[in-house]
Amino acid sequence: MKTESWIINGVNVVEPHGKLMGGSDTDDLDNRLTRLLGQGAKRVVLDLGDTKWINSAGLGVLIHQWNAFHEAGAELRLANLTKKALDVLVISRLATVFSCYDSRDDAIASRA
């Protein structure tokens, strides 16, 4: 899995490409988010528009990172979810835990 990141209007944006199914790909995303939080990032948008599928290992990383960001007083927002990814969050009842946005721009612009 390739993961890109950049800063837009002071907000860190991370965009993984592929599937969050565990293993080294999921570890790469987990490490990147941990590194951003350690560098003092206060707002991170995880753009999941090119994430084709998320399994329990991928959900575990999202939950772990949401907790880490929450404990640090930082925000982790999910944006641009595919229907499959959103279905997984809805079925697992995690869509109510995460701040989910229709687009990356909406997540960046939101002050919630």
Residue ranges and their predicted role:
Residues 1-15:
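Short beta-strand/loop segment at the start of cytosolic alpha/beta domains
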Residues 12, 20, 105:
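Residue-level detector of flexible, active-site-proximal loop/helix-junction positions
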Residues 20-98:
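Amphipathic alpha-helical interaction surfaces in cytosolic regulatory modules
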Residues 83, 105-106:
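Acidic phosphotransfer microenvironment of two-component signaling modules
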Residues 110-112:
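A short, charged, amphipathic alpha-helix used as a generic interaction element across diverse proteins
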